[in-house]
């Protein structure tokens, strides 16, 4: 990092979890506003996404790497060597549904590795470089889940609480450096998140969800204005964000349980199973 610009001097944006959902929509917005891109995801859809993004006329580098692993994080950091990253959107995440006593410990660890560990490991070199240059924008995909105890999504909600606290702490640390840190908090979003997290039999998994393009637009506007944090999405999601500030944790936990309990979408309570799945900006 802290080197040349590609594409004739255009600013460069890094987006993780960019193969679909909010991450892809963020990448599209940055491209349409004249940013070259480095896009990352761990799945095969990344190359297709990169081809579509190149149609905007900017330079797009696709780095396929699994950020749940130290090797994947190192691969992405190495790909940034010699580049000046003007905006970094740390968006990749993984979701998991089910009772904590029933979920696979490996899935629990996968949530922690991607949502927490990779976020910290990537933020360090990116923020160091931005502070050294006295300019830059760092953004985190948090979640409204960060504001409530997540019964039947316990590790996931806790991981998003970490991201939110981490982002707000960094905001104050770099307040006088010329660097801004933004965290945005989407609610349930129309992506593969709930299907891949084994939550299609839950109330939250079957309810109407927000448009990832709308969320990305609000997040893009916020980071370019240097805002600290915001709840993104529909009026309903934003109202939830307001309510979460005043409701007791026990009430929020009870509501979350009713929405996320396996089988809650059906009268007979038949469960579709647990699982962890790559989010790429789902919720």
Q: Residues of each region from the PLM?
A:
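Conserved glycine-rich cofactor-binding loop
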Residues: 19-20
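Conserved glycine-rich Rossmann-like NAD(P)H-binding loop of the short-chain dehydrogenase/reductase
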Residues: 33-48
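Residue(s) in the substrate-gating loop at a strand-loop-helix junction
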Residues: 143
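Rossmann-fold cofactor-recognition segment
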Residues: 54-71
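C-terminal helical subdomain
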Residues: 183, 203-240, 274
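Active-site helix of classical SDR
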Residues: 123, 159
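Substrate-binding pocket helix/loop in short-chain dehydrogenase/reductase
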Residues: 99-101, 107-112
């Amino acid at each position: 990092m802290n080197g040349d610009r590609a594409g004739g001097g255009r600013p460069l944006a890094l987006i993780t979890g960019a193969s679909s959902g909010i991450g892809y929509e963020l990448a599209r917005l940055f491209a349409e506003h004249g940013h070259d891109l480095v896009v990352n995801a761990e799945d095969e859809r990344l190359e297709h996404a990169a081809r579509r993004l190149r149609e905007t006329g900017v330079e797009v580098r696709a780095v396929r790497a699994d950020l749940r692993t130290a090797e994947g994080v190192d691969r992405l950091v190495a790909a940034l060597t010699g580049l000046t990253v003007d905006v970094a959107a740390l968006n990749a995440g993984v979701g998991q549904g089910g009772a904590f006593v029933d979920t696979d410990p490996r899935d629990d660890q996968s949530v922690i590795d991607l949502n927490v560990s990779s976020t910290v490991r990537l933020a360090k070199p990116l923020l160091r470089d931005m502070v050294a240059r006295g300019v830059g924008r760092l953004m985190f995909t948090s979640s409204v889940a960060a504001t409530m105890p997540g019964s039947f999504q316990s590790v996931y909600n806790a991981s998003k609480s970490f991201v939110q606290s981490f982002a707000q702490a960094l905001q104050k640390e770099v307040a006088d450096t010329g660097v801004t840190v933004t965290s945005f908090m989407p609610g349930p979003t129309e992506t593969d998140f709930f299907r891949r997290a084994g939550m299609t039999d839950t109330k939250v998994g079957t309810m109407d969800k927000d448009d990832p393009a709308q969320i990305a637009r609000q997040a893009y506007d916020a980071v370019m204005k240097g805002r600290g944090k915001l709840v993104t999405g529909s009026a309903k999601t934003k109202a939830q964000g307001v309510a979460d500030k005043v409701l007791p944790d026990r009430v929020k936990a009870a509501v979350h349980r009713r929405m996320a309990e396996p089988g809650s979408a059906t009268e007979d309570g038949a469960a579709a199973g647990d699982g962890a799945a790559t989010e790429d900006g789902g919720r």
